[in-house]
Amino acid sequence: MGQKINPHGFRLGITTEWKSRWYADKQYADYIKEDVAIRKLLATGLERAGIADVEIERTRDRVRVDIHTARPGIVIGRRGTEADRIRADLEKLTKKQVQLNILEVKNPESVAQLVAQGVAEQLSNRVAFRRAMRKAIQSAMRQPNVKGIRVQCSGRLGGAEMSRSEFYREGRVPLHTLRADIDYGLYEAKTTFGRIGVKVWIYKGDIVGGKRELTAAAPAADRPRRDRPSGTRPRRSGASGTTATSTDAGRAASEGTVEAPATEAAATAPSAGQPETTES
């Protein structure tokens, strides 16, 4: 199922984290609906900004929105006018105070969402889909942290009557390995022949020290021990079948049994003042 499922959801809690962080009891459905509306608002108004990810965090009276973008100048606007407009729209939507953080993406060629968006923009500009896919793969593989990439396009490719899917892959993309750091992006290109879906998987190596591996690699001293009952049976060595004791009393008892023949021999031996008797 690693070939079908979303890589982020498949590794959630293992190598990836939640993109919405908050707790709610009775307002759970309302908050989810609000999160979807926030992401839709940012996606529709900022198509050219190159938004890679949106993280939402809630407190009692405040909503924090982190926007990861490759073009922060478009999101901020001249003298911050665009950022103020976005903040006002979000406060009107959530009816709470909104803290807006705009974060720049350093390497957009290694972010799957931005790669998919770039391929989709080329398809909308009537660039051949194979050329766009190969160009995206070449630019991504030049990044030092990228170990493998897979790009897939689905739809009426080249204006064909029947839709199909084609993909190109370079390097390793282990979709079944849970410790693998796989970035996934999806974007739709609007063309004259219809919509073409673009999916991108980028493999950035294995994450050593995830939640499960840290728990499994915990030192033995930190793990809870089971208390042995006081009346345990003595251990037996497998070779001779003798009983092995580890207490001081057991050691003394074993030493006493070994030294017993020597004391008996000393008791039967004649003393120095008594003559020895021999039988003729």
Curated annotation (Swiss-Prot):
Function summary: Binds the lower part of the 30S subunit head. Binds mRNA in the 70S ribosome, positioning it for translation.
Protein name stated in the entry: Small ribosomal subunit protein uS3
GO BP field: translation
Keyword annotations: Ribonucleoprotein, Ribosomal protein, RNA-binding, rRNA-binding
Cellular component terms per the entry's GO annotation: cytosolic small ribosomal subunit
Molecular function as annotated in GO: mRNA binding; rRNA binding; structural constituent of ribosome
Skewed-composition ranges (Low complexity): 237-270
UniProt organism field: Mycolicibacterium vanbaalenii (strain DSM 7251 / JCM 13017 / BCRC 16820 / KCTC 9966 / NRRL B-24157 / PYR-1)
Residue span, KH type-2 domain: 38-106
Protein family membership: Belongs to the universal ribosomal protein uS3 family.
Region (Disordered): 216-280
Record InterPro entries: KH_dom (IPR004087), KH_dom-like_a/b (IPR015946), KH_dom_type_2 (IPR004044), KH_sf_prok-type (IPR009019), Ribosomal_S3_C_sf (IPR036419), Ribosomal_uS3_bac-typ (IPR005704), Ribosomal_uS3_C (IPR001351), Ribosomal_uS3_CS (IPR018280)
Subunit structure: Part of the 30S ribosomal subunit. Forms a tight complex with proteins S10 and S14.
